[in-house]
């Protein structure tokens, strides 16, 4: 995340452009509905880690520009729904926002899962970047992780990292 000195006037709203897609920077190629069939989950069990393949459905829709006084974000609202091959029951569900701040090059990912965990991961990239990494760490006030009491006690998440790669064929992938 790149530091940025915002104006002293924190009340005057930034002037957004109506064309969100043209202002998404490195997030623009991610907009749309995607399906991935090569996922592998590593799940902790008492007898050791279990590896499960999965199919992921990922939808990213442009949202109107968002302002916090002089701060201006363009973004994508997303939902990812994951099932195991041949199953209909949800294996993992996640919602949130991918946000791009053109003035700084900062990218934020806010995510929440219905098992009681949320985070904000942050990073920085050029508008035309084909790869970028976002990170969150437990205890941070700006890119942190918060969990329900059971997860905090039994399965503490110390950090989160995701690297996104935009491919020449118009697709994208991530590693976390």
Question: Positions of the model-derived regions?
Answer:
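Amphipathic/hydrophobic helical signal segments and adjacent flexible N-terminal regions
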Residues: 1-75, 156-159
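Short, hydrophobic/aromatic-rich segments at coil-to-beta transitions
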Residues: 31-33, 72-77, 104-109, 129-133, ...
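Generic short beta-strand segments
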Residues: 36-43, 77-83, 135-143, 175-176
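Flexible, membrane-facing loop/turn or short amphipathic-helix motifs
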Residues: 41-50, 85-87, 146-151
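Hydrophobic/aromatic beta-strand elements that line small-molecule binding cavities or substrate pockets
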Residues: 55-66, 94-99, 120-125, 158-166
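Hydrophobic/aromatic-rich structural module bridging two neighboring secondary-structure elements via a short loop
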Residues: 65-109
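An exposed acidic His-Trp-rich patch
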Residues: 95, 102-152
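Mixed-charge, glycine-accented linear interaction segment located at domain edges/termini
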Residues: 141-176
